[in-house]
């Protein structure tokens, strides 16, 4: 844990990474370790011996972090890490914006030889300038200037004592608010009044919404109970049917249409049939008329309509006995069965010849 913090601090401060050296003492079955760390040219040793090498390195890193934190303006370890990572630049900018002032302006000056430059930075805020410690990089010089400005503003006379980091930011914002222009000071009470009015309105709306919500829930519950009781006791709703006068008028129209359709179907059937005497008359209505009737009534009554593919009645079929030409005529029956079975054939001379038929 301490090794990671020390390494992160070195990376963000643009320093070389810390290097560890360890010494071992004691027998092989019970060794003891003591470590030292080199951080930016300074060496820090662990105060006591440890049973493992890792513990010795962590103790050396802890000593280094505590020593570095005591050198800075803040005394805690976490505050020192924040100082080196540039958090105070963000805090200074945020508090200046909150106080209604212009953002801080940093001016850095480079000095020293080209291969080993040094930078010194000054920050201007609310008509005041603050100088920071010189550093090897421009970024670090700006961080140092922000730290110097922050702690100098915090040391200005105040009414209440310091109570943690959150209270510290409020104190700096209050100090900076003294240097605001008069126009911004006049706008502040109006804004505070608007904020208080908005808060009261929101509170009232929340209370009214809660009360109205409770009333609505109670009403909905009562309505649900009433509807359940009514649905269990009341009969089912009646369907809407058209009046009788409309039904009679529509029925008369449908009948006239059916008669016309039937006449048209009879005329068409008479034209299609080859022989009118073979027409088959039935008392049942034609399929066309039935389909028309159903389609007409379907507009009035709520029953589904069915469409069927009806076909016409086939004409009557006459069966005739056909005799082929090539076949011999049928034998005629003999009127005299007692006569002799002879066949007479006339010859060309006028004489007749008789032949007996075979039995």
Swiss-Prot record:
Repeat in keyword set: yes
Region annotation (Disordered) ranges: 266-292, 328-359
Classification via InterPro entries: AtDRB-like_DSRM_1 (IPR044450), AtDRB-like_DSRM_2 (IPR044451), dsRBD_dom (IPR014720)
UniProt biased composition (Basic and acidic residues): 266-280
UniProt cross-references to Pfam families, sorted A to Z: dsrm (PF00035)
Compositionally biased tracts (Pro residues): 328-338
Domain DRBM per the UniProt entry, residue ranges: 1-70, 87-155
Consequence of gene disruption: No visible phenotype.
GO molecular function, one term: double-stranded RNA binding
Keywords (A to Z) from UniProt: Repeat, RNA-binding
Keyword Metal-binding tagged: no
Gene3D superfamilies: 3.30.160.20
Function, in words: Binds double-stranded RNA.
Identification of the protein by name: Double-stranded RNA-binding protein 3
